[in-house]
Amino acid sequence: MTIKSDKWIRRMAQETGMIEPFEPGQVRQSNGQKIVSYGTSSYGYDIRCADEFKIFTNINSTIVDPKNFDENSFVDVKSDVCIIPPNSFALARTIEYFRIPRNVLTICLGKSTYARCGIIVNVTPFEPEWEGYVTLEFSNTTPLPAKIYAGEGCAQVLFFESDEVCEVSYKDRGGKYQGQHGVTLPKA
């Protein structure tokens, strides 16, 4: 597997709609203000967080069970910022919609700007032929509230092209998160 360059990312986004909307360069300012960067980088693509959040709450004193997840464990927020309570987390989604080619696997890593503040972004790989909006998980590891900015960069996607095409893709398997829209909760 080889990591793909900015040139390949631009070509695939423009020719196949691999990333929509797509920013061919690196955006570091908006309306004259510094922002957490997004867009195409040398060997990756910095994704943005949309303005839809699900903030974890323990008001129902429930057990967190990935096989039987209680939707009441979250408070829905639509805003240009998300305040995550201390030692808690929030779910969000990307602005970008992805269509991953059959011979490509991605790895998504959090941006250091957030990590240096104790905010960890977790996203699993995007498998071959997966498509949809990416559900993001932000963990606030600090004892203080933490702020996430919608419309700004939050993680970087690295694209790896295989030397041969997989026999069975995510789409072929009927993956449970295929074509997801909005912030998607766990599915067993």
Swiss-Prot record:
Pfam families assigned to the protein according to its UniProt record, in alphabetical order: DCD
EC number: 3.5.4.13
Disulfide linkage: none
One GO-annotated biological process of the protein: dUTP biosynthetic process
Active site: E137
Catalytic activity line of the entry: dCTP + H2O + H(+) = dUTP + NH4(+)
Residues at which dCTP binds: K111, S112, T113, Y114, A115, R116, T135, L136, E137, Q156, Y170, Q180
A GO molecular function held by the record: dCTP deaminase activity
SUPFAM superfamilies hit by this protein: dUTPase-like (SSF51283)
Class of the enzyme per the UniProt entry, highest EC level: hydrolase
Pathway terms, separated by semicolons: Pyrimidine metabolism; dUMP biosynthesis; dUMP from dCTP (dUTP route): step 1/2
Keyword Nucleotide-binding (UniProt): yes
Keywords: Hydrolase, Nucleotide metabolism, Nucleotide-binding
Record-stated family: Belongs to the dCTP deaminase family.
PANTHER family cross-referenced by the UniProt entry: DCTP DEAMINASE
Name of the molecule in the record: dCTP deaminase
Naturally occurring in which organism (per UniProt): Herminiimonas arsenicoxydans
Gene this chain is encoded by: dcd
